[in-house]
Curated annotation (Swiss-Prot):
Recorded coiled-coil stretches: none
Alphabetized PANTHER family for the sequence: UREASE
Any single Gene Ontology cellular-component annotation: urease complex
Top-tier EC class: hydrolase
Compartment(s) of residence: Cytoplasm
Gene name tied to this protein: ureB
Hydrolase among keywords: yes
This enzyme's EC code(s): 3.5.1.5
Family: Belongs to the urease beta subunit family.
Protein name: Urease subunit beta
Assembly mode: Heterotrimer of UreA (gamma), UreB (beta) and UreC (alpha) subunits. Three heterotrimers associate to form the active enzyme.
Main location: cytoplasm
Length: 101
């Protein structure tokens, strides 16, 4: 085994199967790139990202763990989000929630 190597079963892996999904259009109104990580509470991302923020409360990006999406200045794109699961409690980030969703 090589350090950091991941061994998986043959075939394609499906991530987040059965999770509640939401697709939103996001635009970077700022003058610098903004990168959002896989588990960041999307509701609390940089205010320069413009989208239907209230609709995204309790959601994160539907991407592979440990990866991110980068929004260049002036760029607009659609992203798919998935709902947080488990106890649905959020702490940290921009400190907008600090508890139950």
């Amino acid at each position: 085994m090589i350090p950091g190597e991941i061994k998986t079963d043959a075939g394609d892996l499906q991530l987040n199967v059965g999770c509640e999904q939401l697709t939103v259009t996001v635009a970077n109104s700022g003058d610098r790139p903004i990168q959002v990580g896989s588990h960041y509470h999307f509701y609390e991302v940089n205010p320069a990202l413009k989208f239907e923020r209230e609709k995204c409360r309790g959601y994160r990006l539907d991407i592979t763990s440990g990866t991110a999406v980068r929004f260049e200045p002036g760029q607009q794109r659609q992203v798919t989000l998935i709902a947080y699961r488990g106890k649905r409690r959020v702490f940290g980030f921009r400190a907008s929630i600090q508890g139950d969703l």
